[in-house]
Amino acid sequence: MEEKEEKKVNTEELKNEASTTVNQVKDTIKNVDIKKDSIETKGFIAELFKDPLGKIKEIVDKENNQYFKYAIIILVIWVVAELISRCFSVGPIWGLSSLGSSLMSVIKATIAPICSILVMSIIVLVMNSKNKKSLTTIITTVTTANIPLVIASVVSILTIFGSSISTITIPFTRLCSAVSIVLMYFTLKSIFGEEKNSEFIKKFALVELVYYIAYIVFSLLNIYI
């Protein structure tokens, strides 16, 4: 009986968080000043690279709406980068069936970054029962940890000028992926409020396991998160 009540509470909590997040995204988009906020986002990224762990901890502790705005801008950049890359990678289109297939491929590649952030954020929200944080804060920190991957996606656009450039972009993407994993580890450690690596590493492994199960499910739909 208690277990059913707990599941019910968790479900309601998840619904409330989702509703709050959607409303906050709408408000954030309405209040975006593209020029001003773009400059501030650049400064935010620069500060992150100067002191990544300190900046991540600051985001988790302060739960500042301004950081959420930066995260939205960063995510939009990621989506646009993937959109450009996919549009140029689509081959010649012959007939309506090819058009539909190519269009679907572009859409799936474009929504992949959003799905990636949301999946990881929801997993963390559900598994983090002791040190509760809002979904918007989790989305902000998870997006921040993925900034190296965003940079890699932007750099990968260069391959539209020639496939030989991939000899540079592929190793760079791998490097960015490794940096992102390290940032994600310390991001989740800060969210979970763990001090000792020996205690947190098991939780991190479990979070990653659940994420990669989700990855397999999404990949069956040709969405690679």
What would you call each of these model-derived segments?
Residues 1-43:
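Low-complexity, intrinsically disordered extramembrane tails and loops of integral membrane proteins
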Residues 107-121, 145-153, 176-181:
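Generic alpha-helical transmembrane segments
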Residues 80-89, 115, 119-127, 151-159, ...:
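Alpha-helical membrane-inserting segments
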Residues 156-225:
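Terminal transmembrane helical module of multi-pass membrane proteins
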